[in-house]
Amino acid sequence: MKKSARPYICTFIIALCTSCSVSKFIPEDKYLLDEVRIVSETKEVKPSLFNSYIRQNPNAKWFNLVKIPMRTYCVSGVDSTKWINRFFRKIGDAPVIYDESVALKSQEEIEKAVRNMGYMGATVHLDKKTKKNKLKLAYRIHAGHPYRVRHVVYDIDDLVISDYMRQDSAQSLLAPGMLFDVNVLDTERQRITKLLQNKGYYKFNKDFLVYQADTARNTYLVDLTLRLLPYQRRKEDLPRKHRQYKVGEVNFLADDEIMSVQEGTLEEFDSLRYKGYSMYYKGKAFLRPQVLVDFNRIRPGELYSEQDVQNTYSNLGRLRALKYSNIRFREVNGENGTQLDAYVFLAKNKNKSMAFEVEGTNSAGDLGAAASVSFQHRNVFKGSETFMMKVRGAYEAITGLGVASQDYVNDNYMEYGIESSLNFPQFMFPFLSSNFKKKIRATSEVGLKFTSQVRPEFSRTLASASWSYKWTDRKRMQHRLDLVDVNYVYMPRKSSAFQEYLDSMSLRNSALKASYENQLVVRTGYSFTYNSAGNAMMRTPTKNSYSIRANIEEAGNLLYVASKLVHPNPKDGEDYVLANIPFAQYVKADFDFAKNFMIDPRNSFVFHIGVGVAYPYGNSKMLPFEKRYFSGGANSVRGWSVRSLGPGVYKGSEDGRMDFINQAGDIKLDLNIEYRTHLFWKLNGAAFVDAGNIWTIRDDSGQEGGLFKFNEFYKQIAVAYGLGIRFDLDYLILRFDGGMKAINPVETGKKRYPVIRPRFSRDFAFHFAVGYPF
């Protein structure tokens, strides 16, 4: 079957790569637009700045090399009534036929854009080169001599506004010697407008700021004047001075029925007065007044500030009890002049919801089922606190227990658990001032979880409790503080056969035995994420960007001190315990950096480095299994399946049993480069090269060759290469990656370099994941 398919595959590839079939779609006396370039004679005028002005681009190339979409389209025949031809045309890309009128419009827009940069005499010429029925087009920019600002004069006939601008002059974008750049001039108008709107000038906009430019004779110098126009609502109105507004009354309208009423009819509804604010509602208020006051930034008696309005929107958007909010202002005459009364309309969200999930499971051929039901309340204490509870149960029929099955109480796997969390929309901690809680945009969460697992070999109970905080700042940084996170593992039962197996494996696999012991982990951690493109972790950025993620955590130090005080001298070889439970003690740090280079709107290049180090000490000789690093998988070195690489040159056990336990380490290094390209429709492609491995800090007989050594670790770095397909569904990205081993540090000689003689069955690994790897 495979042999018979080869001729068809070869024929299709040849059809895609040959160009003769393109000509039948090119009309007579027309040309295929083969290439478009922008060329600039001036170093300061970068061609990449004008890509957005190109109205007609050539057919897209996969990986910037081959026009596969166009070739696919050209495989179709001329007869569009045949379904096969329609299919190829639908998935392909029709040849782009050069249009002179469109090119002239692009030429005009590029020329205008260059002149707006300060090159007033700039010209753009079209350079066309034809060969047979193909055309290559170049937009050649002749920028000429730039115009620069000689003097800057401010004509501001308003002492208050003039004083505000003088105080903020250090932030001004205007300065003698600058290019006469129209874009910068407009940005300065927007900056001043934003400044004044935050100083009470509610009706101010940038159109009240105009420039006057005078060019000195026979020079490339410009004398610039920035003038303030008086306020004039309509042409027929008399000009007047710009009015500065203060906030009068602030009213919260917390009911769906009030959303559609006029301000003058609010007396029909229930109301209360709280700390100078008015609340209107019908029946019972669904939010406490204190919550609304804390999340509001619009203060009575203060100057109007657009920034305060936006901050209020942002704060209210964090309240899950609200569907949406709307803020309106009404101009009124107060005792101290013109004021703005604020009306904050609040639409109530649905408080309660339930969800039920059923899933099938297949663990190494053992079939089972799982079900869960969850409940959520978004406004438990009328402060937009979110309570969640989830109950889960699972069952799996286990086969292949072998001769030891007579020692087992059953041949099934059962799991049941319950988890709950309570989320507060503020930083909840005793002794903190209310001002601090208002400034930091944080959420607090308390969580509890209990899980019971019953297998033929053992029974295990897992319990956890956590108290954490999350907050963001305006610098695109997200923070998380795990104040305390307690995890307890209890093994009430082990079958005699399973215990004998663990004892027999303890010498060559100490990590395996440690994974089935009672254990207590009490940790504290902090992590942050910064993304220069904003909250764009899932989507492809539209410009060069980078992201940084870092994490640090420690566990067991307080318990160690407490245990030392209670039992200062334990017996030799024994660990410190709390209530007869040994606890873990370690410190762990991770750093992750990714840089995205945009080549053009369809192609980008991404570089990533990830480093992690964890050190067990004191009461622990080994990290808890869930805190150890592993390599291989969809987000690591993709030529290896998950948890199948390392540590170091560790080859695994002879029988391969429980290798995933041993293939974990204390140090991790990941290096990745990835070329991403848009293919067609919602499909994107990627070509990647990955490198990395994991290592242990201490030598372990069960992980031979896994110890980290400065003079050897670089020789143990594994390398993989591969291709990937990404299906962009807008709300999520489905990723399919196929990796091949290039350098396998475990092997020696020629086998160490499978890239030279690849074998698909030995070197290939397939991965499915959601979202980008970095």
Kindly give the residue locations of the regions a language model identified:
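Bacterial N-terminal signal peptides that target proteins for export
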Residues: 1-9
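Interaction-mediating elements
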Residues: 2, 21-318, 327, 339, ...
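C-terminal motif of bacterial Sec signal peptides marking the signal peptidase cleavage site
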Residues: 17-19
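Flexible glycine-/small-residue-rich
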Residues: 40, 141-145, 156-158, 226-232, ...
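A generic beta-sheet turn/junction motif
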Residues: 132, 554, 600, 727-731
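Gram-negative/organellar outer-membrane beta-barrel architecture
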Residues: 164, 285-286, 305-549, 638-639, ...
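C-terminal outer-membrane beta-barrel translocator/porin domains of Gram-negative envelope proteins
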Residues: 265-268, 277, 361-364, 480-677, ...
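Outer-membrane beta-barrel domain signature, especially the mid-to-C-terminal portions
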Residues: 561, 658-660, 700-718, 749-759, ...
